[in-house]
Curated annotation (Swiss-Prot):
SUPFAM superfamilies: P-loop containing nucleoside triphosphate hydrolases, RecA protein, C-terminal domain. Its main location: cytoplasm. This is Protein RecA. It comes from Clostridium perfringens (strain SM101 / Type A). The keyword Plastid does not apply. GO terms for biological process: DNA recombination; DNA repair; SOS response.
């Protein structure tokens, strides 16, 4: 404001004073008065994805969209975000519009299902009203809507099976997001919308894939993640998991178009150890010569699966490698106490 004319400055101050009198203190302010605000984030539980997102996780007070084909890992990633928020003492809610949430699987991923607020709404309007009420409470840290495609407008549910309802869902989403955006930002809640894929008919050139629910979510979302299964993980004759790639197609809080790759193991979720090995090799913290993986003088094992198993059995080594990677990317360091408690929880849930 140094170069602005004194009369203009005085006029701005007077206008700001009138606005504060009318709408309350804090309704208008100069951005520099508060200093540079630090963008708070909730970890995704996946080191490579936290790095790709640029701020160490999904930003608080923003709308996130996760979309991809069936069985690609959308719900798994969302549940990991819920688990990470709960570990830090946060509250979480899950709007299960698909009526397909598996509490046993959620528990295995580290979600505290006893404290998880769950709703299985009958209509899209009901789902979004519940979402608004929970966000407005200011007590929820992470809220997941699974999924946008399952938010069926009331008129469609009450109508006949063959009736045409063009644009109803898009109008519903557009209206809801207009109402929700400000509330989400004030409450500092992460709202994750899971979405499916559809194909446009008659597209000859370009990408025929699109997401249901109209265009509003594309605009209002601060982060959009495209998640795909790229390979199967085999052990012997059986398939034990999926290799997954996430592309950050939109990011308002950091540079976009970054990618992350990780393992999603069946009944376990995202493999933390596999992620540490992969990122460690990429950053030259873990050395790979032939099939052998080593960290300094410590031999982790021959083959990636053996290296993963070694880190699982030696959490202190895994923590040391992880914190070196986190330091390199200026991410908050992981704590030993938390990591061991997570190990115990995982072991207990697998035994049960």
């Amino acid at each position: 404001m140094a170069n602005i004319d004194k009369d203009k400055l005085k006029a701005i101050e007077m206008a700001m004073g009138q606005i504060e009198k009318q709408f309350g203190k804090g309704s208008v302010m100069k951005l520099g008065e508060q200093g540079a605000p630090q963008m708070d984030a909730v970890s995704t539980g996946c080191l490579d994805l936290d790095i790709a997102l640029g701020i160490g996780g999904v930003p608080k007070g923003r709308i996130i969209e996760i979309y991809g084909p069936e069985s690609s890992g959308k719900t798994t990633v969302a549940l990991h975000v819920v688990a990470e928020a709960q570990k830090l003492g946060g509250a979480a809610a899950y709007i299960d519009a698909e009526h397909a949430l598996d509490p046993v699987y959620a528990k295995r991923l580290g979600v505290n299902i006893d404290d998880l607020v769950v709703s299985q709404p009958d209509t899209g309007e009901q789902a979004l009203e519940i979402t608004e009420a929970l966000v407005r409470s200011g007590a929820i840290d992470v809220l997941v809507v699974d999924s946008v495609a399952a938010l069926v407008p009331r008129a469609e549910i009450e109508g006949e099976m063959g009736d045409s309802h063009v644009g109803l869902q898009a109008r519903l989403m557009s209206q809801a997001l207009r109402k929700l955006t400000g509330t989400i930002n004030k409450s500092n809640c992460v709202v994750i919308f899971i979405n499916q894929l559809r194909e446009k008919v008659g597209i000859m050139f370009g990408n025929p894939e699109t997401t249901p629910g109209g265009r509003a979510l594309k605009f209002y979302a601060s982060v959009r993640m495209d998640i795909r299964r790229i390979d199967s993980i085999k052990q012997g004759d059986g398939i034990t998991g999926n290799r997954t790639r996430v592309k950050i197609v939109k990011n308002k809080v950091a540079p976009p178009f970054k990618q992350a790759e990780f393992d999603i193991m069946y009944n376990e979720g995202i493999s933390k150890e596999g992620n540490i090995v992969d990122v460690g090799v990429k950053e030259n913290i873990v050395q790979k010569s032939g099939a052998w993986f080593s960290y300094g003088d410590i031999r982790l094992g021959q083959g990636r699966e053996n290296a993963k198993q070694y880190l699982k059995e030696n959490p202190s080594v895994a923590l040391d490698i992880e914190n070196q990677i986190r330091e390199k990317y200026s991410l908050p360091l992981a704590k030993a106490v938390e990591s061991t408690s997570v190990e115990k929880n995982t072991e207990e849930s697998v035994e049960s």
